Amino acid sequence: MNRFTQHLLITLMTTVLLGVLAEPAGATNGMFLTSYGAETAGRGGANIAVADRTLALNFNPAGISQLQGQHFSLNLAVLAPQLKFENGLNAETDAKGRYFPLPAFAFVRSRPGSPWSWGLGFLAQGGMGATFQNLRTPFGTRDETYSEVRFGTLTPTVAYAINPDMAIGASFNIGYADASFRFFPHTSYFNAQDPANSFFGAAMNKAGGLQTSERVGWWWRANQKFSFGAIYQTETKSKFDGGDMRINFIAHPQLGREVHYDATMDGFTFAAQAGAGMAYRPTADWVLAFDVKRYFWDHAINTVTVTGRNPDVQGAPSEVVLPFVFNWKDQWVYALGADWRLTPALTLRAGYNYGENPVPSVTLTPLFPATTEQHLSVGAGWLRGNTTYDFAIERAFNKSVTNDNPDPRINPFGPGARVDHAQWTVSFGVSWATDL
């Protein structure tokens, strides 16, 4: 790949990456993606013990010690979720169709003879979002629900090779995330007999802020056939403020209008994770990989509290507090994949990823569905000179969950509310290497 093409691709990808903050992400292992990079996507996300590409810095940072010289990767994944909702007031309703582009760029550099390698990545890490329009509400109106969570990071990474067959590594993730939602924003209902049971629709726009976490990794090649890896990433330190929230008080007898508030969101973060992997090379043309990971959602997402302060209307409540009960569960994820080098230029891949649904049925709402469990993927890589082109397609099979919780404070959509979630993901990548 010539220098002009390198600069052009980097410029284009950087532009797209900066633009990712204009689009929400959809994820399939809770709020994380099953994989990062088309090569890894093709084998179902199994990569902890392989980790021999630049985007390994987002899986197992120790893996970049296997690279010599300068290595670059550009990747674009496009997610197409398919969501349906049904409850006692609404027949089965399709979510608004949306496509979510998720770019990634990574660079790794290591001098021959040096045990040190370092890298830098820009990645769309994950998130979630759903839009349901024209829903019947319990208040005689038709309205919408909408949500989006977006999360991207800059990831500086360093690895140290203890010897040619063992390495350790560390990454620091510094990024930005924001969240928005609309919950029947055009509906306003005042209950004169029981004012406490009135309903005033709400909408929050882009409460966001800095997100930081750390990842450490270990990689060991036991012999020419077996390699092993392990990783741990801390829970993200999250901040969500600077949002704008409006409450629809049009039906309120004293206010009669929408009121805007400064919004913050607390109790929402991205889970810590731990994992281990094994790779087996029965021949020079085959790689079989298996990963097990644990996402600690139970500590990360319980009750998410949105608070509005500083109303722009005199006489409005000085503070509005909206609690959303999530109570997510810890999640086991299993990834199994294979690479087959059919020819010196062509590699074929296939993989399976199973991630337990972390969302309890009693807290599920169409605002934040993240329920898919089973994923099947296929992919291919084409080597031309010092450049590799990768492609993968993943199907997240439909997961249907019904919330029978009668408590309207937790399940405002009523017993029998059902959400179906399936998804297609297509990934494209190009990587190349140069000498120092």
Each model region followed by its residue ranges:
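Bacterial N-terminal signal peptides that target proteins for export
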Residues: 1-12
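Bacterial N-terminal signal peptides
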Residues: 10-20
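Bacterial Sec-dependent signal peptides at the C-terminal "C-region" and cleavage site
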Residues: 20-26
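Outer-membrane beta-barrel porins/channels
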Residues: 26-41, 86-92, 99-436
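Transmembrane beta-strand segments of Gram-negative outer membrane beta-barrel proteins
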Residues: 31-47, 65-83
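Asp/Glu-centered strand-loop micro-motifs enriched in Gly/Pro and often flanked by an aromatic residue
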Residues: 45-53, 90-95
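Outer-membrane beta-barrel pore proteins
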Residues: 48-70, 107-115, 127
